[in-house]
Amino acid sequence: MLAWLRHRIRSYNTSTYSSILPSASFGKVYKIGTKLNFTLLALCLLLACSVFFNYFYLADNNGLDIDTKGEEEENVFKDRKMVIFPNNFEITDKNLLEYYLKTLEEPLHPQDTIYRNRFIYKVPDVSYTSQTINLFSGLSQNSQSSKCEDLSSSYSFDVSGPQNKNCDLYKVLGKFLNDDSEYFQEISPLFPKLKEMLVKKEIEKHWFQLIGSSVWLEQYGVHLMTSRIFYSSTGDKVKPVVSLTYVQVFDHEWREIENVELIVPDGEGKYKPMTYPTFLPMSVYHNEKQQQGRFYGVEDPRITLVRNKLGYDEPIIVYNSHHRKITDAKSDNDGESNIHFKAYRSIFMAWLWQNQKGKNNVEEIETGKMKNRVYVKSKELIKPNNKREDKEKNWAPFINYQQRLQQGFDSHVYFMYQFQDLKILKCSLLDEEDCVWEYQFNDKNGAGRLRGGTELVNINQLLTTFDHPEIKRVKDLMPQNREIWIGVARAALEKCGCGDKMYRPNIVILIKDGDDQYRLSHVSPFVGLGIPILPWWPDKGLCDGKNLIIPNGISSWHLNKDEDNSVQDYLTLSISRADSTVDLLHIKGLLKSILFDDPNSKLLELNDYGFNNKNIECAVKSSDAFCKKYGSEYKLNNNKEEDKANGNGKGSSS
């Protein structure tokens, strides 16, 4: 409009100047000037109407922020949308807009951005400090009778400081309230005072965010992160009423994209938009009339990628959730039934880009509204012979890369069900069958003190992602048919010398030789990674309550070249501190130290030493010593601070 108006004014100016000549009469000039004035007046009125329409009507109908302070035009459209097509999308760039508007029938504002991904993974530009860990090996001959120090080897790598990614809960929950989605209407009776808490600025007293876990979506050039946002009516972090699953998208430099659509496959040969950030409509059981000890919703979601039968990677989450099952139903003579339920906390798996109608997988008695609502597709994971335990938690997922190569896709996801007396489950991604035992060291049951944290990354797959002479050497040395996985578990210690509980990360390495011979080859004791600790209660000490660092997920792991042309690896680990943060740590050189720089790496040796729990016992024993030392040093330093404060208060020093 402005361009057209400028063009018309220029044309009028040109004709006017050419007409106003010394020989022209005054009347002729007057007529031209009058005509110009009326035309300009009409054009100005038209422009004013256009501006008024765009400024008020579009703002009101598209949820845009009205700029009442005269800021620049782009601030008026600060909520513009970004639409990202995968880099392998079959339609040319020039036809993306038409596909979005006509095929997907989605609206676009002129300020929105639409493009095919061109971004690749970026090595984190952060500062590092050196760290050293010990790994206890289970691959040594006579390891069961060996001393722990004889099984230990040291490895060095670099770690960044934690980068916090907690969201603005006022903003996020305010939008959830204002959007008033079907899912919000269903779940909000569990937190009826949300609006009041927003108005009174009391969100931080009752709402918490933790368990951030993410994956790098290579085809989209973004990080997809899930986290747990939970509500506690009492404000006690160990007594949540309900946990919600929040999903965000970050670009390749870890900056959040606040209004983004990913054009993802729908599983039926077509595509659909997925909008982020958002709360996922999860199919969970809940009852606002019974809240005591129930802990409704999705707890501890961990995200990972699987390759489906259509050949693309899609995100799934593994989580635990409270639900109930009918145990008995009896009818009396009047036709009325008495139904008895049993409550469980079970492990579920959900496909973030797939849907289901209704939620009879968690609620066997559905209401009419529930039957027609759309939820994220989910599946309960049940042990063999339909054996459902009262409580299941902390399964550590991993993928069988050899199976993927043979089939072209992932038909199963595997879980380290138990670290001590190793047990591994194999659960189908394709049907509703129960899980089966992939491996059991013995028939002993019990979680033990070493428990699941992150997923385990398949190192064989990682080694295929980068071409380098050192990588070729390692692949040539690796025993045939050996698979290696590395993950981060956590040892759970109670009253070990600092607070009620202490959790820290423990690095673990799992290997498989042949079809089903698994061994937990290496386990580390507690690793602090130089992470600053947060108190459980803001106004208390570090050894009051719980002292926690929980590993949640391996966000990405990439290989590259270092400055000296040697191979280098970059791992991003997500953690939570004090059950109230979403943090990222960048780790450089962990795989390099364990696999490439160790000339005596037993991971590259073929041996048939039997499995035992000795390395786990050593790791837990060393972790316990870490806790006692940490508690003693904290108390000593705390006493010194108190003495110093008291001495200063008396005007003397001690």
Curated annotation (Swiss-Prot):
Its main location: membrane. GO terms for molecular function: mannosyltransferase activity. The chain crosses the membrane at residues 38-58. Pfam families: BMT (PF12141). It is a single-pass type II membrane protein. One of its GO terms (cellular component) is membrane. One of its GO terms (biological process) is glycosphingolipid biosynthetic process. InterPro entries: BMT1. Residues 59-654 are extracellular. Induction: Regulated on yeast-hypha and white-opaque switches, and repressed in biofilm. Its EC number is 2.4.1.-. It is found in: Membrane. Residues 1-37 are cytoplasmic. Disruption phenotype: Impairs the elongation of beta-mannose chains on the acid-labile fraction of cell wall phosphopeptidomannan. Keywords: Cell wall biogenesis/degradation, Glycosyltransferase, Membrane, Signal-anchor, Transferase, Transmembrane, Transmembrane helix. Belongs to the BMT family. Beta-mannosyltransferase involved in cell wall biosynthesis. Required for the addition of beta-mannose to the acid-labile fraction of cell wall phosphopeptidomannan. This is Beta-mannosyltransferase 2. The lineage of its organism: Eukaryota, Fungi, Dikarya, Ascomycota, Saccharomycotina.
